[in-house]
């Protein structure tokens, strides 16, 4: 789906190149920060109301309970390295356009995606890596609609910008939305 939108960015005056930022350690550092935050904000809930929590929330909080100070320190050091690598990447490219998620929307009865293209996901949030890798970089991003699957399910792209260039990200998102009009479309599955 992303490739089919390339011409839109060309039409908007962008020079479009294939490029891969280095997301080394993004997965592990994000999971540490997420677990740490969950434990800080929901640790009392786990201790006092465990029987009322969903298994996914328990898993999230327990990831934070297991952490040590050195774990969080490591994650912070790696986050800064990731931030610097992304800054270097963004010095060469003004924007990064990437998928919002690694797969199209799934059935509402399914709690989370456990497998993508035959690859088993390590945990219940692994299918969202394309989003949380960007989050871990600390760079501004926005998700905008870019079309529909053959089944009529909505698909989006992320527009990622340079650090502190939220305005540039919003401008490109607006231009892309105006050029495509997908934001006005009601997914066929909803009609």
Set out the residue ranges of the language-model regions:
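Gly/Ser-rich, acidic/histidine-flanked active-site/gating loops
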Residues: 1-32, 65-66, 71
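Structural helix-boundary/capping segments
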Residues: 3-12, 67, 72-76, 84, ...
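Short helix-loop capping/hinge segments that flank enzyme active sites or metal/cofactor-binding pockets
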Residues: 17, 34-87, 99, 103, ...
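Conserved beta-strand edge residues that scaffold enzyme active sites
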Residues: 22-24, 103-104, 148, 190
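Tryptophan-centric aromatic hotspots in well-structured domains and transmembrane helices
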Residues: 23, 30, 59, 83, ...
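Short low-complexity, flexible loop/linker segments enriched in glycine and/or proline
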Residues: 30-35, 113-114, 157-159
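Short, surface-exposed loop/helix-turn segments at secondary-structure junctions
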Residues: 74, 106-127
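Conserved acidic residues
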Residues: 94-96
